[in-house]
Swiss-Prot record:
One annotated GO biological process: cytochrome complex assembly
Protein name per UniProt: Cytochrome c biogenesis protein CcsA
Keyword Chloroplast carried by entry: yes
Bilayer-spanning residue ranges: 12-32, 45-65, 72-92, 100-120, 145-165, 234-254, 263-283, 296-316
Organism: Phaseolus vulgaris
Oligomeric and partner information: May interact with Ccs1.
Gene: ccsA
Amino acid sequence: MVFSTLEHILTHISFSVVSLLISIHLITLLLGNEIIGLDNSFKKGMIITFFCITGLLVTRWIFSGHLPFSNLYESLIFLSWTFSIFYMVLCLKKKKNYYFNTIITPSILFTQGFATSGLLTEMHQSLILVPALQSHWLMMHVSMMILGYTTLLCGSLLSVAILVITFQELIHMIGKSKTFFFFNETLSFAEIKYMNMNDKKNLLQKTPFMSDSSYINYYRYQFIQQLDRWGYRTISLGFIFLTVGNISGAVWANEAWGSYWNWDPKETWAFITWIIFAIYLHIRKNKKLEYLNSSIVASMGFLIIWICYLGINLLGIGLHSYGSFTSN
């Protein structure tokens, strides 16, 4: 009873704090750095969230006697914890990435909100592990897969942001009433795109022959380039986690079911996810196809991850149906 009450308190504290953090972040985005204290409040709030979710997982671990990876509810809580870990790593490196803040806080809110919703009420009660899950591979496989999903989701959302910015600019240019302005904007963007980045200081010095739209295009391109760079790094890390998770899962499957691969729905979609992001990394290495093309592939990967992680669990089909929505 004590553990259940403590778990309930920690869940609601973390959920409430994250909800407040989203409001703080929106105010920061709208007002910039005019309110200095908000940035510190955001960091403190994320630290509180991290420790609350950590306490929640530890409490459930002690109460159940096994790692909290046995069902969809526990994996969602662990997923929200890995999102908070992602933020803590950035804090330790003292990097201020507002676009990561924009991604991480809603992700924690969504995962915790769904985990604590009425749909998964029956999973809140910790149960004894089924024989297939009573293995030392449980921690290795599940933790690597969840870490992979977390980093890949963050990287994919950065790619989605690139597509949104790009298509907004495209729609804006198409909406120009005069063809002259359309070509002017396009040529200005193309000219700045291929300029030597070492001449950045010279470019920032306003000259009579450069229009204001040129400065807007330059900063937009710089922002897209930064998003793409961080997205590539994040997805590369997530791809490593996903690869290790798939390999450890195959070894575990051989021990449990006598076969490394059974083309189970979960396994199939995990393989599709791996293929999608392998294609992304291949395209990203090609200078002619980077940015827009690689971002489209990564955005597809975002949807594929949710089908693999959440969709299959909700349907409750295949060998991975234990701990799913329909199996209860």
